[in-house]
Amino acid sequence: MNQYAVWGNPIAQSKSPRIHQLFGEQTGKSISYVAKLGNELNFENELMQFFAEGAKGANITAPFKERAFSLADEYSESCLLAEACNTLKRLDDGRLYADNTDGFGLCSDLERLGWLKPHQRVLILGAGGATKGVLFPLLKAKQQITIYNRTLEKAVRLAEKFAKYGKIRTASLEQIAEQQFDLIINATSLGLQGKYVPVAAHLLKSAAVYDMQYAPDMQTPFLNYARECGAVRYQDGLGMLVGQAGFAFKLWENEFPNVEKVLKQLKNEMENAK
């Protein structure tokens, strides 16, 4: 039985063990997947011990993605650009391969929704790790990206780093209000404090609105605000979570699961748990 785990802090809320359990049942793969509360002081030692004991792979979530990145021996292109990994695989020779499947999870969910068309005007809110993890796949999909971040310098540095991969620029809230967008993505963690970026209402009304965070009935602070502004096309990040997990599962087990089927089951379980 192949051993896997997701590492984070906090981690009790993670849906990943359930998602991978469903993937295993669906594909007939014999796997064990557990949640591990990472120790801020000893994370690297704990993770390397996990692999030394024979584990085949691990998912990494906040706040350890950058630290896990530094432990790897080989990297995917998306992982190198993000400078953070959410997926590690132990290779046959014992070395660690690092990937970042967040962006592919996002793009696959946007495709499922019919929201990923070439040359769209996309506004991304935030310039932190979540944004870094998705820029490369979005630019590969020929999205025209504008980044807003409260600290403009951070957004500018990110835009400069990814400029050679496609159209990307930065803007202030005032500049954003004078533009039009086809898709608006919230990649900030403000929702964890019950806050959101106050994007101009007319933009939310006309665009498709996507929040990387998720909640039962899509009741995230940003999506609640978007609905109040008249948004009619909106979605939370549960599909992105299941999607990135699907790409990690494929990396480990060499079989891509039916993501949509698992997403539907997860939504039903969350609905029934209310």
Curated annotation (Swiss-Prot):
Cross-referenced Pfam families: Shikimate_DH, Shikimate_dh_N
Binding residues annotated for shikimate, in chain numbering: S14, K15, S16, T61, N86, D102, Y214
GO molecular function: NADP binding; shikimate 3-dehydrogenase (NADP+) activity
Catalytic activity: shikimate + NADP(+) = 3-dehydroshikimate + NADPH + H(+)
EC number assigned by the record: 1.1.1.25
Record's GO cellular component terms: cytosol
InterPro entries found in the cross-reference section: Aminoacid_DH-like_N_sf, NAD(P)-bd_dom_sf, Shikimate_DH, Shikimate_DH-bd_N, Shikimate_DH_fam, Shikm_DH/Glu-tRNA_Rdtase
Source organism, top-level taxon: Bacteria
Signal peptide range in chain numbering: none
GO terms classed as biological process: amino acid biosynthetic process; aromatic amino acid family biosynthetic process; chorismate biosynthetic process; shikimate metabolic process
Residue numbers binding NADP(+): E77, G126, A127, G128, G129, A130, N149, R150, T151, L152, E153, K154, M212, G237
Active site: K65 (proton acceptor)
Keyword Amino-acid biosynthesis part of the UniProt annotation: yes
Entry keyword annotation includes S-adenosyl-L-methionine: no
Pathway(s) of this molecule: Metabolic intermediate biosynthesis; chorismate biosynthesis; chorismate from D-erythrose 4-phosphate and phosphoenolpyruvate: step 4/7
Protein keywords: Amino-acid biosynthesis, Aromatic amino acid biosynthesis, NADP, Oxidoreductase
PANTHER family per UniProt: BIFUNCTIONAL 3-DEHYDROQUINATE DEHYDRATASE_SHIKIMATE DEHYDROGENASE, CHLOROPLASTIC (PTHR21089:SF1), SHIKIMATE DEHYDROGENASE (PTHR21089)
Function text: Involved in the biosynthesis of the chorismate, which leads to the biosynthesis of aromatic amino acids. Catalyzes the reversible NADPH linked reduction of 3-dehydroshikimate (DHSA) to yield shikimate (SA).
UniProt subunit comment: Homodimer.
Family statement drawn from the similarity comment of this UniProt entry: Belongs to the shikimate dehydrogenase family.
Protein name as annotated: Shikimate dehydrogenase (NADP(+))
Source species of the chain: Actinobacillus pleuropneumoniae serotype 5b (strain L20)
